[in-house]
């Protein structure tokens, strides 16, 4: 019979092995273009009153170049949208790029999302800064953007999906600036410095959606996986974001920001009439419910428009559902 100390060491060794193998034990279903090896490069020329520069703006889809100020729709069956946008407000064209390809080494690309101040100058008359944050998600952006009001209403979030994965699996890395502040800057008024740094975030939310006779869309939350990252890391490969089914509000890991999305936090989707409407979550679904849609999002910010920690960067790669 082994000694108590020896048995304990063996047990610990087995636990370490099992823990290190957990990502490999899942069957992975890759999300299309989720290795971020393919990118569309758009060349958008801003209005002459803004200087008339041509900016590079990137999208996640089969490799190609698009020249000209053209609204973008997802190409080649790509399910990914980005916070990179072509805006045309009262006839003035502006481009913004906070999401771009990044070489991990040897030509192995990932996606890089950064928080930065976007400068807007109009012939020396207007000089303002807007805090913009890099974000990618499953869905569509409706271009051109014509106003800064209700940002979520420009984002068609979520795609049809009926499976029940146990995890979202991905590689990630965080660069967190050595500061404990955030900047709020909408472009109107003086930028404000807020105490407390922002954080990067990844979520995978499963919903069961339906539409009423008036075209309103509602949902119940089927599954929840949501994490926030508050400090710098090296590359963490094969990370598992576990998805928990049913009502999680009584679970020890539950945080308020994992809650239901309603009101100004509600995502938007097109209803059967082609109108963008909010998708209000009205409750938690049964633990064995089948979803109709999945929302996957990764961002270098925690979801408040025009608020961020400048320089905070999230790198993201090799995204898959784990079963």
Task: Give residue ranges: language-model regions.
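Short, conserved, GDST-rich strand-edge loop motifs in beta-rich repeat architectures
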Residues: 186-192
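Bacterial Sec-dependent N-terminal signal peptides
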Residues: 1-30
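Aromatic (Trp/Tyr/Phe) and Gly/Pro-enriched flexible surface segments
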Residues: 26-165, 195-246, 257-322
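N-terminal non-cleavable signal-anchor helices
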Residues: 15-19, 133, 172
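Substrate-binding/catalytic groove segments of enzymes
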Residues: 180, 249-257
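A short secondary-structure junction signal
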Residues: 180-185, 214-217
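A short beta-strand element within beta-rich, extracytoplasmic domains
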Residues: 164-174
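Extended, low-complexity, turn-rich repeat/linker tracts enriched in Gly/Pro/Ser/Thr and Asp/Glu
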Residues: 174-181, 192-197
């Amino acid at each position: 019979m082994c000694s108590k100390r020896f048995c304990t060491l063996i047990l610990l060794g087995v636990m370490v092995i099992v823990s290190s193998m957990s990502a490999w034990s899942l069957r992975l279903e890759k999300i299309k273009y989720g290795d971020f090896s393919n990118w569309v490069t758009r060349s958008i020329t801003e209005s002459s009153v803004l200087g008339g520069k041509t900016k590079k703006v990137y999208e996640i889809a089969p490799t190609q170049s698009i020249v000209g100020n053209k609204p973008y729709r997802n190409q080649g069956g790509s399910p990914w949208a980005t916070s990179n946008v072509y805006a045309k407000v009262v006839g003035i064209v502006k481009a913004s790029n906070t999401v771009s390809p990044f070489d991990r080494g040897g030509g192995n690309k990932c996606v890089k999302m950064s928080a930065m101040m976007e400068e807007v100058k109009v012939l020396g008359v207007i000089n303002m800064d807007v805090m913009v944050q890099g974000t990618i998600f499953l869905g569509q952006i409706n271009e051109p953007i014509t106003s800064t009001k209700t940002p979520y209403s420009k984002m068609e979030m979520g795609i049809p999906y009926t499976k029940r994965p146990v995890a979202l699996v991905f590689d990630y890395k965080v660069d967190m600036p050595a500061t404990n502040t955030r900047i709020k800057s909408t472009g109107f008024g003086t930028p404000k410095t807020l105490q407390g740094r922002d954080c990067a975030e990844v979520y995978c939310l499963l919903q069961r959606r339906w539409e009423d006779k008036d075209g309103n869309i509602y949902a119940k939350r089927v599954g929840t996986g949501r994490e926030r990252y508050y400090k710098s890391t090296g590359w963490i490969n094969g990370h598992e974001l576990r998805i928990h089914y049913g009502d999680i509000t009584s679970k020890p890991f539950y945080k308020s920001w994992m809650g239901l999305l309603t009101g100004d936090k509600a995502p938007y989707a097109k209803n059967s009439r082609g109108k963008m409407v909010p998708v209000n979550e009205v409750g938690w679904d049964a633990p064995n419910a089948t979803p109709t849609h999945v929302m996957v999002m990764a961002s270098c910010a925690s979801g408040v428009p025009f608020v961020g920690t400048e320089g905070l960067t999230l790198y993201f790669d090799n995204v898959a559902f784990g079963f």
